[in-house]
From Swiss-Prot:
InterPro entries: Aminotrans_V_dom (IPR000192), Aminotrans_V_PyrdxlP_BS (IPR020578), Cys_dSase_SufS (IPR010970), PyrdxlP-dep_Trfase (IPR015424), PyrdxlP-dep_Trfase_major (IPR015421), PyrdxlP-dep_Trfase_small (IPR015422)
Modified residues annotated as N6-(pyridoxal phosphate)lysine in this record: 232
Pfam families tied to this protein: Aminotran_5 (PF00266)
Name of the protein in its database record: Cysteine desulfurase
Entry EC no(s): 2.8.1.7, 4.4.1.16
Catalytic activity, reaction form: (sulfur carrier)-H + L-cysteine = (sulfur carrier)-SH + L-alanine; L-selenocysteine + AH2 = hydrogenselenide + L-alanine + A + H(+)
Gene Ontology process terms (BP): cysteine metabolic process
Gene name as annotated: sufS
Transit peptide recorded as keyword: no
Keywords annotated in UniProt: Cytoplasm, Lyase, Pyridoxal phosphate, Transferase
Cofactor: pyridoxal 5'-phosphate
Species this chain originates from: Photorhabdus laumondii subsp. laumondii (strain DSM 15139 / CIP 105565 / TT01)
């Protein structure tokens, strides 16, 4: 299969517009990726001709819509190589997925005096829920620090895991630094360390950034949980996926109560809950979002996951080389990375640089990127972040470099 970025761009009409008199250069896909026509049209078709509430109706439209939603569950299981569709829980996004784990798994398995391990490179979505829970339960949160290259030193892990470590929760791909963590090796090492101390350790991987750049095989990774959002994968917002190992989901209590997640409700006899994954899907789901997610998976699969990765890696190599031509530009993170490039320009505030770039039609992200510990690590308040996607071109990178050089001249 031959990957053609020119052909891919035809699937994204938003990229044809001009911003401030310049062709749009969209380098903010790590925040949210643009949507291809096929995803938009599939959602529209469903709403126009097929929409109905799912799971509880016996009429034709409801039964058909239920089959479509459940087919996407099977599709996602296949896409990330889960063992069963029953290991796929639909959530609003990565943030809700991690909060679900914290409030269900965490309350069931983590006790006062226990500890968990997170890393210094985490998005706030994989920090705040654990601190909120720790305030209530009283467990310790241990932090795996970054090294000078923006990577994790695996030798340090042995000092963090002991017999009372219940969870290791870390990102697959840093949303700021582009660091690709060696997930399989980390998990293998962590499990070995826990086994040596007769501990019971589970592993959560935040796949929000990795899902659009890498093929994911949760069985090969040997993680217990893997979470990601649809809108990073060229799908709609408001829908995401929590993969959970079935034996764990079976043992976890529901987090939210309501319709659809029960077997029986009796004011006299009490409540019995549905089996996973439906136990964790209270209320009416984001039906159209699920349909759109299925269309997004169809789209990226049709392009070829290996081909996408090759295109993006070649583009990253090109971008890293070209950005070094900008004299006062400081890069953050490792030389080998995927998806995102964090930088600052001289002593200029990231907000000012981003505002100037916008005048040239270039969309990047500025700020702390919901990763304040990373900012603290590098002793800065904010960074600029350019991110790559399937529709990014070398011409986009060239435009960024030229604009940064102009800003250097303007701001001094």
């Amino acid at each position: 299969m031959t990957f053609s970025v020119k052909k891919v761009r035809q699937d994204f009409p938003v990229l044809t517009q001009q911003v401030n008199g310049h062709p749009l250069v969209y380098l903010d896909s790590a925040a949210s990726a643009q949507k291809p026509v096929s995803v938009i049209e599939r959602e529209s078709e469903f709403c126009l001709h097929q929409y109905a509430a799912v799971h509880r109706g016996i009429h034709t439209l409801s039964s058909a819509a239920t089959r479509m939603v459940e087919n996407v569950r099977y599709q996602i299981a296949q896409f990330i190589h889960a063992q069963s569709h029953e290991e796929i829980v639909f959530v609003k996004g990565t943030t809700e997925g991690i909060n679900l784990i914290a409030n269900s798994y965490g309350r069931k398995f983590i006790n006062n005096g226990d500890n968990i391990v997170i890393t210094e490179m985490e998005h706030h979505a994989n920090i705040v829920p654990w601190y909120m829970l720790a305030e209530q339960i009283g467990f310790e949160i241990r932090v795996w620090p970054l090294n000078e290259n923006g990577e994790l030193d695996q030798a340090i892990l042995a000092s963090l895991i002991d017999s009372r470590t219940k969870l290791l929760s870390f990102t697959h791909l840093s949303n700021v630094l582009g660091t690709v963590n060696p997930v399989r090796q980390i998990i293998k090492q962590a499990r070995k360390l826990a086994d040596e101390q007769e501990g019971r350790l589970h592993i959560l991987v935040d796949g929000a950034q990795a899902i659009m750049h890498k093929q994911i095989d949760v069985q090969d990774l040997d993680c217990d949980f893997y979470v990601f959002s649809s809108h990073k994968l060229y799908g709609p917002t408001g829908i995401g996926v929590l993969y959970g190992r079935k034996s764990l989901l079976d043992a976890m209590p529901p987090w939210e109560g309501g319709g659809a997640m029960i077997k029986q409700v009796s004011l006299q006899k009490g409540i019995t809950y549905a089996e996973p994954p439906w136990r964790f899907e209270a209320g009416t789901p984001n039906i159209t979002g699920i349909i759109g997610l299925g269309a997004a998976v169809d789209y990226v699969t049709s392009l070829g996951l290996d081909e996408i990765q090759q295109h993006e890696q070649a583009l990253m190599d090109y971008a890293m080389a070209r950005l070094k031509e900008v004299k006062t530009l400081k890069l953050y993170g490792p030389e080998q990375r995927q998806g995102v490039i964090a930088f600052n320009l001289g002593r200029h505030h990231a907000y000012d640089v981003g505002s100037f770039l916008d005048q040239y039609g270039i969309a990047i992200r500025t700020g702390h990127h919901c990763a304040l510990p990373v900012m603290e690590h590098y002793h800065v308040s904010s960074m600029c972040r350019a991110s790559l996607a399937i529709y990014t071109t070398q011409e986009d990178i060239d435009a960024l470099v030229v604009a940064l050089q102009r800003i250097e001249q303007l701001l001094g």
